[in-house]
């Protein structure tokens, strides 16, 4: 991907409101918050705020919105910069949902449509700058409390990336090359989102530069081709 094509892609994202600071107030909460996998269109009205999805998530990715979010108070969401969704086998969060807010027909990754990743400030990307991962950039992840082997595996992968060329967004993506891969821009590496991105948010979590966001409830075509 050359610089002209990259600028065209990011310009399209910015035009759709997903450039720097894309989290602007919207009229509908589902456009603001990243929901767990399988969230249905009318999630807001179906979620009974029971917290079952929160309890069963092995990565502790899901939280409940607080009073600051108004009518969304108590509904489940994912803060991708804190902890993305690792798209577990069998989707325990979906199976635990008693109200239908998370669609039980969600049984495989291809069923998931949480959103799509957006790279902003590409010139700050460590891969683009040809810089290694610095310990200070991943300290927040390494200091996270670990509760199980799955979380430990993520921590180990992050720890092993220190002082090496950065590709964490690509190497830890639970979808794989169909969602994100390293492309060339001006002869330098740069992560490129693809049609297979489901908006899980792992890339946003593990990015040392914190320059990846997730556009919730949006498709690849809406952001990059709209």
Please give the residue ranges for each predicted region.
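Non-ligating segments of multi-cofactor redox enzymes
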Residues: 1-190, 194-226
């Amino acid at each position: 991907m050359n610089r002209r094509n990259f600028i065209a892609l990011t310009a399209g994202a910015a035009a759709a409101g997903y450039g720097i600071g894309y989290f602007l107030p919207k009229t509908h909460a589902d456009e603001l918050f990243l929901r767990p996998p399988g969230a249905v269109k009318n999630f807001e009205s179906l979620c009974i705020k029971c917290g079952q999805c929160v309890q069963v998530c092995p990565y502790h990715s899901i939280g409940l919105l607080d009073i600051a979010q108004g009518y969304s108070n108590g509904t489940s969401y994912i803060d991708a910069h804190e902890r993305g969704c690792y798209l577990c086998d069998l989707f325990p969060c979906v199976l635990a949902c008693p109200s239908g807010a998370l669609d039980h027909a969600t049984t495989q990754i291809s069923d998931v449509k949480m959103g799509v990743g957006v790279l902003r400030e590409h010139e700050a990307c460590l891969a683009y700058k040809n810089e290694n991962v610095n310990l200070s950039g991943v300290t927040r992840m390494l200091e996270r409390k670990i509760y199980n082997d799955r979380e430990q595996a993520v921590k180990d992968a992050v720890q092993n990336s220190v002082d090496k060329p950065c590709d964490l967004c690509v190497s830890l993506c639970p979808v794989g090359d169909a969602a994100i891969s390293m492309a060339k821009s001006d002869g330098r590496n740069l992560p490129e989102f693809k049609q297979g991105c489901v908006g899980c948010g792992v890339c946003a979590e593990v990015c040392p530069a914190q320059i990846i966001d997730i556009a919730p409830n949006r498709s690849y075509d809406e952001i990059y081709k709209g």
